[in-house]
UniProtKB/Swiss-Prot annotation:
GO terms for molecular function: ATP binding; hydrolase activity. It catalyses: GTP + H2O = GDP + phosphate + H(+). It comes from Sinorhizobium sp. Residues 261-354 form the CobW C-terminal domain. Keywords: ATP-binding, Chaperone, Hydrolase, Nucleotide-binding. The keyword rRNA-binding does not apply. Belongs to the SIMIBI class G3E GTPase family. ZNG1 subfamily. NCBIfam families: CobW. Zinc chaperone that directly transfers zinc cofactor to target proteins, thereby activating them. Zinc is transferred from the CXCC motif in the GTPase domain to the zinc binding site in target proteins in a process requiring GTP hydrolysis. PANTHER family: COBW DOMAIN-CONTAINING PROTEIN, COBW-RELATED. One of its GO terms (biological process) is cobalamin biosynthetic process. The gene is cobW. A motif (CXCC motif) lies at residues 77-80. This is Zinc chaperone CobW.
Length: 354
């Protein structure tokens, strides 16, 4: 029996993964607003205590996915908490009277997709849901700038001389695992690079995985629902061919640890001059090697909150929705960096900007 026939009648689920700041949430927001009449159930796994991505999507006003259809798993990597968090959450979603037509799962930028995909073979889930496909979103501008290539070349060259350098950096492993798991790769932010840069990105991404999934280009996360949904792969049946670094380490008796990354929340008052704040924030991010920053700001005299999303020195900002009646106004930012980031120094530097 073919995979497509075996999965008839099951709810399709699309796993959307990608490195920090690749544009997953923006792409999902666009998808929800153009869902072709499908009712979408959304599970969001965020890294950090403040559920920024979930709040952004809840505020998008899409009829395809109401607030009740959005479930957040915060402050825990879904790849490490499948049994405790994901499976009970999925079961609860399936028990609803008004079940979704399609389920979208957004992993955190730190999640390994493979354990999540394997969870769809859990008996209670396998009989009800199939993985329609895994979509990996790539920050084309970051890859074009050599963010991963430099680390790979250095480690690969030194590994021959030093047995202690047998494993590549955790960031690079995440990138490669997300590519290896993909059925569709979205090269996002292609408007930020030229034709030669795009070719280099395609070559780089292709070299990172032995599998050759389809690659498409996008800007601002704009990809049609007809492209993202309905792949019909049944990825859970092919998980053995998508082995991650994580699984290979476990086979060798090693453990996976997300302590390479830290996150914390900075809470501030109002931002009187957001343009000046953003400009100075770029300096703080560059000085302290902050990987990702995201959150909201309160601007006096503005009825809407200002959404702030930073990947490296590149910062996007826009007013996303009005403050709710009785909602406490303020500025809340999630900062994500490597484990040796000086939290006290970063917190003090950001606080000093106000």
């Amino acid at each position: 029996m073919t995979t497509a026939r075996a999965n008839q009648g099951k709810i399709p689920a699309t796993v959307i993964t990608g490195f920090l700041g690749a544009g997953k949430t923006t792409m999902i927001r666009n998808l929800l607003q153009n869902a072709d009449g499908k009712r979408i159930g959304l599970i969001i796994n965020e890294f950090g205590d403040l559920g920024v991505d979930g709040d952004v999507l809840k505020g998008c006003g899409a009829e395809a996915c109401t607030e009740d259809d959005i479930i957040e798993l915060t402050n825990g990597c879904i790849c490490c908490t499948v049994a405790d968090d994901f499976i009970p959450t999925m079961t609860k979603l399936l028990e609803r009277e008004n079940r979704p037509d399609h389920i979208i799962i957004e992993t955190s930028g730190l999640a390994l997709p493979q354990p999540l995909i394997a969870a769809f073979n859990w008996p209670d889930i396998r009989s009800e849901v199939t993985v329609d496909g895994v979509v990996t979103v790539v920050d084309s501008a970051a890859v074009a700038a050599g963010r991963f290539a430099d680390d790979h070349d250095k480690v690969d060259a030194l590994r021959v001389e030093d047995d202690n350098l047998d494993h590549e950096s955790p960031i690079e492993e995440l990138f490669e695992d997300q590519l290896t798991a993909a059925d569709l790769i979205v090269l996002n932010k292609t408007d930020l690079i030229d034709a030669s840069g795009l070719k280099a990105v395609r070559d780089e991404v292709s070299s990172r995985t032995s599998r050759k999934p389809t690659m498409i280009e996008a800007k601002n996360g704009e990809v049609a629902a007809a492209i993202l949904l309905g792949l019909g792969v049944g990825t859970e049946s092919d998980i053995a061919n998508r082995k991650s670094h994580h699984e290979m380490e476990h086979e060798a008796g090693e453990e996976h640890d997300h302590d390479e990354f830290d996150s914390f929340v900075v809470e501030l008052g109002s931002i009187a001059d957001p343009a000046a704040f953003i400009d100075r924030l770029k300096g703080v991010i560059a000085e302290h090697d902050v990987l990702r920053l995201k959150g909201f700001a309160d601007v006096p005299g503005k009825p809407m909150r200002l959404l702030i999303q930073a990947v490296g020195a590149r910062i996007d900002q826009y007013y996303d929705r009005a403050w709710g009646a009785g909602e406490k106004r303020g500025t809340r930012l999630v900062v994500i960096g490597l484990h040796d980031m000086d939290e006290a120094a970063v917190r003090a530097a950001i606080t000093a900007l106000v």
